[in-house]
């Protein structure tokens, strides 16, 4: 630290400098600790360098590790597309830079007194003696030129003293131009340039804010839209027009040898062609090399109007040179009256200067004259004044200028020895207006635009920062290398951490495919139009549509989006007609927020023989799951087809002794038969679940748990994701000739990556349903599996069944009993007791007009219940849709059948428990054997994947291959606070998989997830807890609400044990194009790929097979379809 330090720094003004180039400096008054004051001058680039040094030296204070800890002030960003040396830019930056200086010196001493800050504010020699604006002696003679005095009384010593700065003309670039030589400049449309020289070849020497070079004049236009100086018309007496002469007096004198040459010529000058030219359009004239042409009209755009062989037209000026006949006349008039010439080529011809390598024309002129060197050609030599007396430059001065002048080769593009051949021979493009030139069109903008959005909530703690919620659209104005972006969100602007902002392709409904650029926002399911099913002997669902060509749509992120339509999936007849299923339930009478997207229909791609012979596999989201010929496999069903957000899949057990169906039977047909029989047997038998590995997933802390009883002779559907399935009696185990339909093609809707559920402690004691997404979470290496299963079982048995049943009733929000009079054809979204009164467990603010807001503890009257998790309620005089997990039934309305159903099937439950547990355990061990063999996992994204936001609700959708799919509105995550302490839940963190078993803390709408993780030991025994809880008392009706909305935007997993490795070779085909990024693999439609790993979050690790060189990478599972 330095005792001598800066006390205050104030930026008072801006000042323009022209050395070494045009720029502005900021005048800063610096007050030091010894009360002395100094005035220093710093340009913006010095501020920028200081800022980068400070951010590198103090990364913590610069907010690179944690943006909230940043204390180093922000600096205005660089000007990318405007010139930083114009005054309005400098003045606009004046106040921000003043605030930056003031804040910088007030930082803690270890920053404000560091060496970098001290050196920046320390006075330098140029601060003590600011440079004077002496344009005549400036080093950059290619930019600032001296104006020679017109008065004949001026002498050599007064030339520099009375010099005035030349005013350069500014032109606007009308179209983009990419340089083709090092001596040229690239131009951007709309850019303003200073024209230093206008050459008759059509190539102008211009200056931008950063560099100088040659550009075609046809790409430039005067700021007022005119081109007054473009034509060089000579009068009848041979004099240059007054307007042209005024311009030449300012510009062309720079590039002559300083001589005032009298140019007596006729109106039509004779030129000789130096190269052949072929006409490109009707108004041009072609010619051979060495022919003489007459120039009728000249201009500075490089195209002259000539006459050749009686025809008139345009020709490139760079292909012409002055005829030899005119040279002697010019040379005689060197000492004559003053006249201006417009081209350095004429002077070079006049002085008989030819390149030694140029053998086309012999040297001309008098032999007594010494040839002029390259360096001399660019020197401003003073020749004859108007009175004829020579103004000679001393020899010492001439040699000094020759050494230091930068104006050499690129000055005269037609000089072969001092310019690139291309500039001498290549004509510039013609202009459209009078010359017939069509300017090149700028490139088309990209067809897919990128938009930015916030991925989590951020509260700014700095003055010029901006606070925002997750899921908001942001417009990025400036990107800082320090990790902060200047963004606009709504009407507000400010700096935001780049790690909280992600990009995606702008939704465009006209595009066929929907390919989001990041894996954190999975693409939506491609919907298709339903049509009438066709009769199929192999078996297709008669009541549902056949596959059509899919039509892809972009997701609508601001509304609740679900990958299905609101039509209930279960189509069945009342008692008796088990196979037809033609009757469609009525639609709800009000539009639910859940209905936004159609579902896609796909064709079941595997025959029953393939299914029977293929070993079972467990898939998530996309997986086509072959079913084995056993009945105990159905015991993994959660039976929760009505609860929103239900996403469960049964784990099949092979070769069960209770399977009545022969191996040759069509399992798909059997499943369709069970769908039709679901309602018939739901009140005829009390069924208990006997599988010891059951997992119920729910996102709601207030969800209820229910158990299904199963007798020895009963059957259950193989997946609870088949909406409307109930436990069916054994009568459906044999094939019915009336039921020849397999799974509907529409049941294979392409899913969105569904959220991982959060386990509820209350359900762990009574829930007896199986969910593969939860089962995956419990899979661990083989050595740990058996002990974990048995240990958790004994651990779970310590809790009495009464507690589980009681907690289940407390957490339930919509348990309404079904009686035997309930017709099977009643839609699932409408239940008995719809007029029940419920109490709100938390306040809710509506997001859409169709919703309703209510405070905490209010009584509402439920009018209608939709399976999406949204209930139509009346609160006071208002009616609207409300999320069901905000509602809790009153105590007197809880069913008292909860304790009656659990005892009926205990005996049969215990008989098959050990058998099914052993078989399922073997299957899990086999999977974990593969899990242990593959330890290498792809890199986990370093950026937070998008935060999780509260949505308006999730819904149970049509299943595809026995898997329930859910799509939600990616706004934020809302997890209601647990009403009881015995609820086991999870905390959501950034950069963590939702499978982490943590302690839940209530997170409000649009909040950021940074809660602390609690011990994960409580969740280790969850896999067997369900098995030990099967004797607990619980209601018969599986109406738990698992509808807590969870955003599909999620990270890739962290723990390797969460991967499910398939020991079979699974080949899938992509159903749409997908553009990958640094973390995921891109592919085209119709590409075959082998699935190597299936991750619960919906991303599969595949090997692409159709490419020339197969490669591996992560792909979204909802872009894949099982290969036939």
From Swiss-Prot:
Cellular component, GO, one term: cytosol
Post-translational modification: Tyrosine phosphorylated by SRC. Phosphorylation plays a regulatory role in the protein localization. The intramolecular interaction of the PX domain with the third SH3 domain maintains the protein in the cytoplasm and phosphorylation disrupts this interaction, resulting in the redistribution of the protein from cytoplasm to the perimembrane region. Phosphorylated on serine upon DNA damage, probably by ATM or ATR.
Tissue expression summary: Widely expressed. Not found in the spleen and testis.
InterPro entries associated with the record: NADPH_Oxidase/PX-Domain, PX_dom, PX_dom_sf, SH3-like_dom_sf, SH3_domain, SH3PXD2_PX, SH3PXD2A_SH3_1, SH3PXD2A_SH3_2
Pfam families tied to this protein: PX, SH3_1, SH3_2
Molecular function GO terms recorded: phosphatidylinositol binding; phosphatidylinositol-3,4-bisphosphate binding; phosphatidylinositol-3-phosphate binding; phosphatidylinositol-4,5-bisphosphate binding; phosphatidylinositol-4-phosphate binding; phosphatidylinositol-5-phosphate binding; protease binding
Domain PX: 4-128
Biased composition (Low complexity): 633-669, 692-709
GO terms, biological process: in utero embryonic development; osteoclast fusion; reactive oxygen species metabolic process; superoxide metabolic process
Entry keyword DNA repair: no
Region described as Disordered: 414-443, 504-672, 692-830, 886-952, 1020-1050
Subunit text: Interacts with ADAM12, ADAM15 and ADAM19. Interacts with NOXO1. Interacts (via SH3 domains) with NOXA1; the interaction is direct. Interacts (via N-terminus) with CYBA. Interacts with FASLG. Interacts (via PX domain) with RAB40B (GTP-bound); interaction promotes invadopodia-mediated extracellular matrix degradation.
Domain note: The PX domain is required for podosome localization because of its ability to bind phosphatidylinositol 3-phosphate (PtdIns(3)P) and phosphatidylinositol 3,4-bisphosphate (PtdIns(3,4)P2) and, to a lesser extent, phosphatidylinositol 4-phosphate (PtdIns(4)P), phosphatidylinositol 5-phosphate (PtdIns(5)P), and phosphatidylinositol 3,5-bisphosphate (PtdIns(3,5)P2). Binds to the third intramolecular SH3 domain. Required for interaction with RAB40B.
Family: Belongs to the SH3PXD2 family.
Biological role stated in the UniProt entry: Adapter protein involved in invadopodia and podosome formation, extracellular matrix degradation and invasiveness of some cancer cells. Binds matrix metalloproteinases (ADAMs), NADPH oxidases (NOXs) and phosphoinositides. Acts as an organizer protein that allows NOX1- or NOX3-dependent reactive oxygen species (ROS) generation and ROS localization. In association with ADAM12, mediates the neurotoxic effect of amyloid-beta peptide.
Protein name: SH3 and PX domain-containing protein 2A
């Amino acid at each position: 630290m330095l005792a001598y330090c800066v006390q205050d720094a104030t930026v008072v003004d801006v000042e323009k400098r022209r050395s070494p180039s045009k720029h502005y400096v900021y005048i800063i008054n610096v007050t030091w600790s010894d009360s002395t004051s100094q005035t220093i001058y710093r340009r913006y680039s010095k501020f920028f360098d200081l800022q980068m040094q400070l951010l590198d030296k103090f990364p913590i204070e610069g907010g690179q590790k944690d943006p909230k800890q940043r204390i180093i002030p922000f600096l205005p960003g660089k000007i990318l597309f405007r010139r930083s040396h114009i005054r309005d830019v400098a003045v606009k930056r004046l106040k921000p830079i003043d605030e930056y200086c003031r804040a910088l010196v007030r930082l803690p001493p270890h920053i404000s007194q560091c060496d970098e800050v001290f050196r920046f504010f320390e006075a330098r020699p140029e601060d003590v003696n600011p440079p004077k604006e002496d344009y005549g002696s400036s080093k950059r003679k290619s930019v600032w030129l001296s104006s020679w005095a017109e008065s004949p009384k001026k002498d050599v010593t007064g030339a520099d003293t009375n010099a005035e700065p030349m005013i350069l003309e500014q032109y606007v670039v009308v179209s983009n131009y990419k340089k083709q030589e090092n001596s040229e400049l690239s131009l951007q449309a709309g850019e303003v340039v200073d024209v230093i020289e206008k050459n008759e070849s059509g190539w102008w020497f211009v200056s931008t804010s950063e560099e100088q070079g040659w550009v075609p004049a046809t790409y430039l236009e005067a700021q007022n839209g005119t081109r007054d100086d473009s034509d060089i018309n000579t009068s009848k007496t041979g004099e240059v027009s007054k307007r042209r002469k005024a311009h030449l007096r300012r510009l062309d004198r720079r590039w002559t040898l300083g001589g005032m040459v009298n140019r007596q010529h006729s109106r039509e000058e004779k030129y000789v062609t130096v190269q052949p030219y072929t006409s490109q359009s009707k108004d041009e004239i072609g010619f051979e090399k060495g022919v003489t042409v007459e120039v009728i009209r000249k201009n500075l755009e490089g195209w002259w109007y000539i006459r050749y062989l009686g025809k008139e037209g345009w020709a490139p000026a760079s292909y012409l040179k002055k005829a030899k006949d005119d040279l002697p006349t010019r040379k005689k008039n060197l000492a004559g009256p003053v006249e201006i010439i417009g081209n350095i080529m004429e002077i070079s011809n006049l002085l008989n200067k030819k390149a030694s390598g140029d053998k086309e024309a012999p040297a001309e002129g008098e032999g007594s004259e010494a040839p002029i060197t390259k360096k001399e050609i660019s020197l401003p030599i003073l020749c004859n004044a108007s009175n004829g007396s020579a103004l000679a430059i001393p020899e010492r001065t001439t040699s000094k200028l020759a050494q230091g002048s930068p104006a050499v080769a690129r000055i005269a593009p037609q000089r072969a020895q001092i310019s690139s051949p291309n500039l001498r021979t290549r004509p510039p493009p013609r202009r459209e207006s009078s010359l017939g030139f069509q300017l090149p069109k700028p490139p088309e903008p990209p067809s897919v635009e990128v938009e930015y959005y916030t991925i989590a909530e951020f509260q700014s703690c700095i003055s010029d920062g901006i606070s925002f919620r997750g899921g908001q659209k942001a417009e990025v104005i400036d990107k800082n290398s320090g990790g902060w972006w200047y963004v606009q969100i709504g009407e507000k602007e400010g700096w935001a951490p780049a790690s909280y902002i992600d990009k995606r392709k702008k939704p465009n409904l006209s595009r066929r495919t929907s390919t989001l650029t990041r894996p954190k926002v999975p693409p939506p399911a491609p919907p298709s139009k339903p049509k009438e099913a066709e009769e199929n002997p192999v078996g297709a669902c008669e009541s549902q549509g056949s596959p059509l060509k899919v039509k892809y749509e972009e997701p609508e992120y601001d509304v609740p989006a679900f990958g299905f339509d609101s039509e209930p999936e279960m189509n069945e007849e009342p008692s008796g007609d088990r196979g037809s299923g033609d009757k469609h339930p009525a639609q709800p009478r009000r539009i639910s927020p859940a209905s936004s997207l159609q579902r896609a229909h796909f064709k079941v791609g595997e025959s029953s023989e393939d299914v029977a012979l293929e070993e079972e596999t467990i898939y998530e989201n996309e997986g086509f799951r072959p079913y084995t010929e056993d009945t105990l496999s159905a015991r993994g069903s959660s039976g929760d087809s009505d609860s929103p957000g239900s996403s469960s899949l049964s784990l099949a057990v092979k070769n069960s002794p209770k399977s009545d169906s022969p191996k040759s039977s069509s399992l798909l047909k059997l499943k369709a038969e069970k769908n039709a029989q679901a309602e018939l047997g739901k009140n005829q038998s009390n069924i208990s679940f006997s599988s010891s590995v059951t997992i119920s997933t729910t996102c709601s802390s207030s969800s209820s748990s229910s158990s299904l009883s199963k007798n020895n002779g009963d059957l259950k559907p193989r997946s609870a994701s088949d909406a409307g399935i109930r436990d069916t009696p054994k009568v459906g185990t044999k094939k019915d000739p009336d039921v020849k339909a397999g799974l509907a093609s529409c049941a294979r809707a392409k899913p969105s990556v569904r959220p991982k559920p959060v386990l509820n402690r209350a359900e762990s004691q009574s829930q007896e349903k199986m969910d593969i997404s939860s089962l995956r979470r419990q899979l661990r290496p083989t050595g740990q599996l058996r002990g974990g299963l048995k240990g958790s079982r004994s651990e779970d048995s310590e809790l009495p069944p009464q507690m589980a049943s009681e907690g289940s009733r407390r957490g339930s929000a919509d348990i309404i009993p079904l009686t035997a009079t309930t017709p099977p054809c009643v839609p699932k979204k409408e239940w008995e007791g719809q007029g029940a009164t419920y109490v709100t467990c938390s306040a809710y603010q509506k997001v859409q007009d169709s919703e309703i807001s209510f405070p905490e503890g209010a009584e509402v009257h439920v009018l209608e219940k939709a399976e999406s998790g949204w209930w139509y309620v009346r609160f006071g005089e208002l009616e609207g849709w409300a999320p069901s997990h905000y509602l809790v039934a009153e105590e007197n309305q809880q069913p008292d059948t909860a304790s009656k159903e659990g005892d009926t099937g205990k005996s049969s439950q215990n008989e098959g428990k050990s058998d099914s547990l052993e078989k399922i355990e073997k299957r899990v061990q086999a999977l974990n054997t593969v899990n242990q063999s593959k330890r290498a996992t792809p890199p986990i994204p370093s950026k937070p994947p998008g935060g999780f936001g509260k949505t308006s609700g999730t819904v149970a959708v049509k299943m595809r291959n026995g898997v329930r799919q859910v799509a939600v509105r990616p706004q934020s995550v809302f997890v209601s606070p647990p009403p009881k302490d015995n609820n086991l839940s999870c905390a959501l963190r950034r950069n963590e998989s939702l499978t982490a078993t943590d302690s839940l803390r209530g997170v409000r709408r649009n909040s950021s997830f940074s809660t602390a993780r609690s011990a994960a030991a409580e969740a280790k025994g969850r896999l067997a807890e369900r098995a030990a809880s099967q004797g607990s008392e619980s209601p018969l009706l599986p109406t738990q609400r698992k509808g807590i909305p969870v955003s599909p935007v999620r990270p890739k997993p962290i723990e390797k044990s969460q991967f499910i490795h398939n020991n079979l070779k699974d080949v899938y085909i992509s159903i749409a194009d997908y553009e990958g990024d640094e973390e995921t693999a891109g592919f085209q439609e119709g590409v075959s790929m082998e699935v190597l790993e299936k991750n619960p979050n919906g991303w599969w690790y595949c090997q692409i097979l159709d490419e020339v060189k197969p490669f591996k990478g992560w792909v979204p599972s909802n872009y894949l379809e099982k290969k036939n």
